[in-house]
Amino acid sequence: MTQAPPSPQAEGRKLLRLEARNSETPIERKPEWIKTRAKMGPEYQHLQNLVKSEGLHTVCQEAGCPNIYECWEDREATFLIGGEQCTRRCDFCQIDTGRPKPLDRDEPRRVAESVRTMGLRYATITGVTRDDLIDEGAWLYAETVRQIHELNPGIGVENLIPDFSGKPDLLAQVFESRPEVLAHNLETVPRIFKRIRPAFRYDRSLDVLTQARDFGLVTKSNLILGLGETREEVSQALRDLHAAGCELLTITQYLRPSPRHHPVERWVKPEEFVELKDEADEVGFTGVMSGPLVRSSYRAGRLYRQAVEAREGVTA
């Protein structure tokens, strides 16, 4: 789950029926373990000053991600592409739904230059779903990866993509840009999937990962806890993801962005996240990050290196 900055378009518009129902439940009080301490190392402080002086934009900073201190210290950052509005609505997501502005074809170049200016070692690219476009935004996702690689030789790039309606030709276009990691987030379990992600399909999301695996890419996904799933359903989702070809996994606690979003059904204790990591390791994932404040791009470069080491071990 990659957070995005609040969309100004969401302010003042009429609430959807679902949003009105969600708003009847007050924002939940967070438990004691949902907090982080700011550890501002030299790399973080350097990037913070650089981003401010150069007028750069990252999801990390604009969404107030709790992991920004660790990720920036590792010279890792996440960028949102495709605009501020998404053509689909997921009940956990902070990005507003609506009619996006025309595609900005210069965006890949600007993102690549931001990556170079920041001197990043690893960059994650994520963005909105663009069902309004013939190619659903496939060119944009692919071109951004290409531009980053061209301008920043040796950098790792993670491409966190929508499902592109599961169309093999669109997915292949994205795969051919050869990101170090191809990520597509499953997010939740089958029983509540349609309620939480009505424009996506559980099986189709798994198939996106399978197609990426078959193409030869390192694959990654995310599960959000606290949306109404059961522990047994999470275990099954782990097995489904691994069977689909997913190698890397992040598991996180749902934090409600606003009253119009899905209420938090439960606060998962830290020890359960530890248990789930152990279970995912046993299932066969090559890299797992599991914790209340983990996000899908958290320590992304470290997870990628684990996948590379695992693959090298198999071929050695």
Swiss-Prot record:
The residues listed in the UniProt record as binding [4Fe-4S] cluster 1, with positions renumbered to this chain, are 60, 65, 71, 297
Annotated SMART domains: Elp3
What this protein needs as a cofactor is: [4Fe-4S] cluster
> Which Pfam family is one of this chain's hits?
Radical_SAM
Arranged from A to Z, the UniProt key words for this protein are: 4Fe-4S, Cytoplasm, Iron, Iron-sulfur, Metal-binding, S-adenosyl-L-methionine, Transferase
Q: Where in the cell is it found?
A: Cytoplasm
- Annotated [4Fe-4S] cluster 2 binding lies at 86, 90, 93
Pathway it acts in? Answer: Protein modification; protein lipoylation via endogenous pathway; protein N(6)-(lipoyl)lysine from octanoyl-[acyl-carrier-protein]: step 2/2
Which Gene3D superfamilies is this protein grouped with? Aldolase class I
- Span of domain Radical SAM core: 72-286
A GO CC annotation recorded here is:
cytoplasm
Source organism's superkingdom? Bacteria
Q: How is the cofactor bound?
A: Binds 2 [4Fe-4S] clusters per subunit. One cluster is coordinated with 3 cysteines and an exchangeable S-adenosyl-L-methionine.
| The keyword Zinc-finger appears for this protein | no
Q: What class of enzyme is it?
A: transferase
Q: State the Gene Ontology terms under molecular function.
A: 4 iron, 4 sulfur cluster binding; lipoate synthase activity; metal ion binding
E.C. code: 2.8.1.8
Which intervals of the chain form a coiled coil? Answer: none
NCBIfam families hit by this protein: lipA (TIGR00510), PRK05481.1 (NF004019), PRK12928.1 (NF009544)
Regarding protein family, the annotation reads:
Belongs to the radical SAM superfamily. Lipoyl synthase family.
Q: Which PANTHER family match?
A: LIPOYL SYNTHASE, LIPOYL SYNTHASE, MITOCHONDRIAL
Protein name as it appears in the record: Lipoyl synthase
- UniProt organism field: Nocardioides sp. (strain ATCC BAA-499 / JS614)
